[in-house]
Amino acid sequence: MDGNDAPNAGQCPVMHGHAAGTGMRNHHWWPNQINLKVLHQHSSKSDPMGAQFNYAEAFKSLDLDALKADLTALMTDSQDWWPADYGHYGPLFIRMTWHAAGTYRTADGRGGGSTGNQRFAPLNSWPDNGNLDKARRLLWPIKKKYGDKISWADLLILTGNVALESMGFKTFGFAGGRPDIWEPEEDIYWGSEGEWLAPSDTANSRYSGARDLENPLAAVQMGLIYVNPEGPDGNPDIVASGHDVIETFGRMAMDEAETVALVAGGHTFGKAHGNGPASAVGPEPEAAPIEAMGLGWLSTHGSGKGADAITSGIEGAWKPHPTTWDMGYFKVLFKYDWELTKSPAGANIWLATNVEDEDMVEDAFDPSKKHRPMMTTADLSLRYHPKLLPHAKRFAEDPAAFADAFARAWFKLTHRDMGPRARYLGKEVPAEELIWQDPIPAGTQIDADDAAALKAQILASGLSVSDMVSTAWASASTFRGSDMRGGANGARIRLAPQKDWEVNEPAKLARVLGVLEGIQAGFSSGGKSVSMADLIVLAGCAGVEQAAKAGGHQIEVPFTSGRGDASAEQTDAESFAVMEPVMDGFRNYQARELSTSPEEMLVDRAQLLGLSAPEMTVLVAGLRVLGANHGGSAHGVLTNRPGVLSSDFLTNLLDMGTEWKPSGKGVYEGRDRASGAARWTATRVDLVFGSNSQLRALAERYAQDDAEASFVADFVAAWVKVMNADRFDLT
């Protein structure tokens, strides 16, 4: 063979050997090219459910009791192809659920169990998810039976609850409402390392300085959920491991008490698997041969399953009675001294010394055998790290407090990424309102006449188009589709910490809110009421309408009332602090230099807002000419008529009479090619709409002479989409 697939004379003229989508891709040739595909993932073309499918309605028809009964029966229905430890699949399913939800991180709200993403790469093949493919395969007959009434995302979470309940634990509750995705998530940054479990001193490490973990990451190594259980980089340093435990769980929204409860509660059940050489384990699912049918980590050690199973390489159970909820974990943790040794797979583990017979652990498959309790390095940090020890001692002495803390922390773990209670479905939703759910009081409705009257007052108040538009944008654009947090509902822009964020220009914000509060008070004195959340959005709509009218377009921006106003008591300021933007390309704001380019951060923000590339294009172009820039900056305000909704930004950006050159860090100056006279200044997030071929194509379309009305209409549609992004009551 010469490698040439061109047909020889007399042969079939059809080319063979190269399928669609293969070969070198654009990102291989130009690795710094921004990735706009993240704005168009999970489209209708990859979703088999159809546009009319409503998962919330389908879930309401689910017989939850029957489903839970089937799941309970599955727990002890051991299968020969993957037998259950101790005759009970509960611990396996708890790990499955934990690892589905545990990828969540607060910095960008991405990860977590709300999409069923554990079915897809890379998560389905992470080293830390070893053999969870077997857990999902065990669930398939039940998913097949209940079909569209239960998503994989909900099933992966519910199964963990049922597993706990089947072993004697009372859970805090369960909420459905997680629709499935049907393709891998391409927007999530999992790290830059080029190998699984790369140590912290490797190239492209996520660590810098004295072990400072890169944001937004919340795991210590590529392919792990949280920490390396053997210790940092596999080094069995107990106190250092405790630091990792605190940091990674903290980045997943857990405080130290919740962290201790989760570790101890989860390790009350089951065992770890490392009863053989790691070299016997086959490739992960995505790398497995086609005949493996999606299963990975197939082992040649003995039977490859049951007593011979190898998963993490750690071997052993934490306590006696691994399928029963009790206080055994804390009992053995504090009762015994621990000696460092190696598992059969070569992993660092700690075994209790001088163990009394009552604390020996029964073998998972042979009742004639018993083993000493095992702890990982991370487990022992609960006893030896000074910040974790007080919580561990308190729980060890108070079983009721431990059970309550674990129940609440487990519920938080499995529901933190669902957003507000308005998205919760089912009869097991807890009645108690929790601060981390970002509660918002019910709003009031105003009719069209009231809205018109209020807009007239706003327009007569002295507020500029820039004031109205920028304040509404600041309020609504906090929304994150990743974990459904933020948004205009609640009007938390009035409260700490948002009112003090630099990006929101606190002095200007206070002035605008003061004017709107006066209008609100006057309206309410008439026996009616309007929330500040609604009024802020309504003011933005009024500003857009006025700007469009100034450009010759008579429009009405759709507005739906019903937002409520959250109080300071309903707002966890610390949890909102992580949402403060250090970069917002829509407002041409950058607080500091980042390792990621400004244009990439613009795309990142657009993806969190659920925007497409065309929507991002019209919003940036419109917000520039409406004066939404941070601090009134002139960068990117490519118009001679600011305050008028027009496509001037795009028209002038594409003008070949302008030559752009760098004029400072991140700033560019546009000069007349012929005269050299200064015309404009702009940033990278402005110029990208002329430099990137895909964005330029969109810019050219909206800059056409016949596209002005289309631009205005599309800007309004994208604006309304952002204003209503958190209105789960409307869907």
Swiss-Prot record:
Residues forming the catalytic site: H99 (proton acceptor)
UniProt xrefs under Pfam families: peroxidase (PF00141)
Cofactor info, note text: Binds 1 heme b (iron(II)-protoporphyrin IX) group per dimer.
Co-factor requirement: heme b
GO MF: catalase activity; heme binding; metal ion binding
Catalytic activity: H2O2 + AH2 = A + 2 H2O; 2 H2O2 = O2 + 2 H2O
Protein keywords: Heme, Hydrogen peroxide, Iron, Metal-binding, Oxidoreductase, Peroxidase, Plasmid
GO biological process, one term: cellular response to hydrogen peroxide
Site (Transition state stabilizer): residue numbering on this chain: R95
EC number: 1.11.1.21
NCBIfam families: cat_per_HPI (TIGR00198), PRK15061.1 (NF011635)
Name of the protein described by the UniProt record: Catalase-peroxidase
Gene: katG
